[in-house]
Structures are given as C-alpha cells and as structure tokens.
Amino acid sequence: MDLLGAAKPQWPWRRCLAGLLFQLLVAVCFFSYLRVSRDDATGSPRPRLMAVEPVTGAPNGSRCQDSMAAPARPTLLILLWTWPFNTPVALPRCSEMVPGAADCNITADSNVYPQADAVIVHHWDIMRTPSANLPPPTRPQGQRWIWFSMESPSNCRHLEALDGYFNLTMSYRSDSDIFTPYGWLEPWSGQPAHPPLNLSAKTELVAWAVSNWEPGSARVRYYQSLQAHLKVDVYGRSHKPLPQGTMMETLSRYKFYLAFENSLHPDYITEKLWRNALEAWAVPVVLAPSRSNYERFLPPDAFIHVDDFQSPKDLARYLQELDKDHARYLSYFRWRETLRPRSFSWALDFCKACWKLQQESRYQTVRSIAAWFN
C-alpha cells in the first residue's frame, strides 16, 4: 500500500512529456506538408536523393554516365610497305568509304615504321626475295603485319618464307581476316538508276579479252573446243587489238562474255566477271570455280556456268538459242531490278583494313600463310 502510494506522483510527469513529444511530431509533419505543397504549387522540383548534373562540355546535355564511356581511341597509323604493283593511289577519308569506320592515317612513307600501328605488305611486290623485302624483323611492340594479295595461289610464290611473320590476312578469299573481293552486289537504295538494256546495241555474240595466253591451260583448251561450234571474238596479245580506254565500249556490243579465270581456286572471281562482263552488260559465261561458289556472290540466273552443259558443243547451242529468244536472254538481267554490281578499289581495301584494326585489337599470329592459302 505504501509502495503504491509513493509511485503515484511520477505518472503525471510522464504523461506531460509524452504529450509534448506528440505535439512536436504533429508540428513537424504539418510544416513538411506545407513545404511540399508550396513546391508543387510553384512548379519547383521536389528534392531528390541524388541530383545528376550534365558533365561540363558533354554534347546534348549528356549525363554523367556518358563520362564512363571509353575515351576516343587515337587515330591508327597504317603503313603501306609498298604501293600495290608500285603504283600510288589516292587515299580518301575512310570514314567516307566504310560505314562506321573512323579515319586512319594511311601512308607509304617507310620512315613512320617505328610508330605504325600496322603494316600492310602486298605479296606481289615482295615475293621474289621475301627475306630481303619484308619490313625489319624487330617490330615495335603491338604492331600488326597484314599479308595482302589479290592474286591466286598459282601466282603467289615463296609463301613458305612468310611463316610466323604476319598477324592478319587480307585477300579475295572469304575466309580472310579482312575480306576484299574483286566485286559484290548491293541493293539499290531507291529506284534503279540505270537505263533499260538496249538490245539493239548488242550486235555481236561472244567476246573474250585475254592477256595471259597459256595454250595448255584449262580455259584455253575449253575455248578451243567451243570455237569449233561458235564464233568467239578474242581480244588481247596475239589477237584482236583492244586500244586503251575502249574496252567497255567494245565489250558492250556483245551479248556474252567468257569470264574465264587464269587459275581455278575457291572464291577467285575477278574483274573478268565484275568489270569486263557485268559493267559491259554482257552475260558472263564462267568456267571455275564451281557453280555453288559463284552462287555465294551472285544470283543463280546472273551467269552461265560451263558445268551446266555436257560439252562445249551443248553450250554453243544454248548461247545460239538465247541469241534468238529475247525473253530468255533478258531473264539474265532480272536481278538488276534490285541489285547493282560494285567493283573493288585499292583505297577501299585499305579502309577495310582500317576498320578491322579498329574493331579488333587482339594480337594473333598466322603460323603458315602457305598452309592456309594454297
């Protein structure tokens, strides 16, 4: 009883303290509400947990996450160890030639060798004595050497001398590190810009322009069998003259062109088809590689393959039939309604190398060019 009576005076004090704390809490909530309401009414932004401000100098108000992106890489320096076939070419900006590529500094000045990020070596120009004609064997750290050839294995000597020197391959072969075909087809960006084929201008039947005449080669043997059944006009050394600058004008008079390659290797489809035949609007007649190989790059009805016929005599008969049947002949040009042929240039090939080097920085070694290319 006495204990209970002694405790009673403490309870009123605790009630008073609790009441004061409650009133203080209500006041804080009330003023917070008034502040938020005022901000909403004036249009001022509510305070955020973290404000992300634009980075000074960043374009278009880029936020700070843009500053985390990798800094722009320095412009690559690419050395052409030689001009192809010792013939200088104009070098435009790669950003204008290859979509998505940045510009590279491309030069044939060998004095920049110690600073070059990559060196392009054109095989034809060093193949006679590779050991004497290659760049210095002590290369700067990280420098990549690119082996470059547009010739077939039949015309590339001393490949074995290059084992272990190169880091990338660059050629017409589709399995090259840098694929540089002689030509390709691309879609029209709009309506086809070329005029319809003028059949009345096609006054001749079959032509062939050949500079490297080898009597024992497969293409010469096939031609000799074919011309026994069909007239073929042959231009070049020891044949009909073809003055400089008149090739396209001359070949455009023909309905068909023998796009016979000088050697028979996979993917080796050269200017004989892309320029001599297609730019002259002549239907190409091809010998090798296989039809399936050609169809990797062309529609099946864009060319005539000799393998489709049992003999040269059968091919001759077919060409004579097409000569008289305009509708069937014109069917070999239907693909031009949606596609157009394009031809390579040295400058474009160098810019493809520029793009590849920008995209892939890993360092590798091609152990044997010969084992891969032959």
Curated annotation (Swiss-Prot):
Glycosylation positions in this chain: 60, 105, 167, 198
One GO biological process term: protein O-linked glycosylation
Coiled coil: none
EC number: 2.4.1.152, 2.4.1.65
SUPFAM superfamilies for this protein: UDP-Glycosyltransferase/glycogen phosphorylase
Catalysed reactions, semicolon-separated: a beta-D-galactosyl-(1->3)-N-acetyl-beta-D-glucosaminyl derivative + GDP-beta-L-fucose = a beta-D-galactosyl-(1->3)-[alpha-L-fucosyl-(1->4)]-N-acetyl-beta-D-glucosaminyl derivative + GDP + H(+); an N-acetyl-alpha-neuraminyl-(2->3)-beta-D-galactosyl-(1->4)-N-acetyl-beta-D-glucosaminyl derivative + GDP-beta-L-fucose = an alpha-Neu5Ac-(2->3)-beta-D-Gal-(1->4)-[alpha-L-Fuc-(1->3)]-beta-D-GlcNAc derivative + GDP + H(+); an alpha-Neu5Ac-(2->3)-beta-D-Gal-(1->4)-beta-D-GlcNAc-(1->3)-beta-D-Gal-(1->4)-[alpha-L-Fuc-(1->3)]-beta-D-GlcNAc derivative + GDP-beta-L-fucose = an alpha-Neu5Ac-(2->3)-beta-D-Gal-(1->4)-[alpha-L-Fuc-(1->3)]-beta-D-GlcNAc-(1->3)-beta-D-Gal-(1->4)-[alpha-L-Fuc-(1->3)]-beta-D-GlcNAc derivative + GDP + H(+); a beta-D-galactosyl-(1->4)-N-acetyl-beta-D-glucosaminyl derivative + GDP-beta-L-fucose = a beta-D-galactosyl-(1->4)-[alpha-L-fucosyl-(1->3)]-N-acetyl-beta-D-glucosaminyl derivative + GDP + H(+)
Transmembrane segments: 16-34
Pfam families registered for this protein in UniProt: Glyco_tran_10_N, Glyco_transf_10
Residue ranges that the UniProt entry lists as topological domain Lumenal: 35-374
One GO CC term on file: Golgi cisterna membrane
Pathway assigned to this chain's UniProt record: Protein modification; protein glycosylation
GO molecular function: 3-galactosyl-N-acetylglucosaminide 4-alpha-L-fucosyltransferase activity; 4-galactosyl-N-acetylglucosaminide 3-alpha-L-fucosyltransferase activity
The entry's keywords: Glycoprotein, Glycosyltransferase, Golgi apparatus, Lipid metabolism, Membrane, Signal-anchor, Transferase, Transmembrane, Transmembrane helix
Its membrane topology: Single-pass type II membrane protein
Residue ranges that the UniProt entry lists as topological domain Cytoplasmic: 1-15
Name of the molecule in the record: 4-galactosyl-N-acetylglucosaminide 3-alpha-L-fucosyltransferase FUT5
